[in-house]
Amino acid sequence: MIEIFGKPQCPFCDRAVSLCEQRGYEFTYKSLGTDFTREELFESFPTARTFPQIRVRETENTWTYIGGYDQLAEFVKHGDVWTD
């Protein structure tokens, strides 16, 4: 499961969603102001400075931080896969 933290009118957020849809990955999209606040974003991603912020659930209680869209694209390009 991929979790994408994005914001409205963010081209890289849209690209991350499109990439997940094209690859058939299960994902959730959370939008700033609707699903989380900036404060909550910084609690989960203290070094975040751009959108989107993306993580992958490895196990029920374990998340691996991927980064932004470019890092997600590299992750997918190298054939890294995960299970839900």
Residue ranges and their predicted role:
Residues 1-28:
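Local sequence-structure signature of Cys/Sec-based thiol-disulfide redox active-site neighborhoods
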Residues 23, 44-45:
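Residues at alpha-helix termini
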Residues 25, 49, 61:
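Structured loop/turn residues at beta-strand edges in well-structured enzyme cores
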Residues 56-84:
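Non-catalytic, surface beta->alpha helical segment in thiol-disulfide oxidoreductase systems
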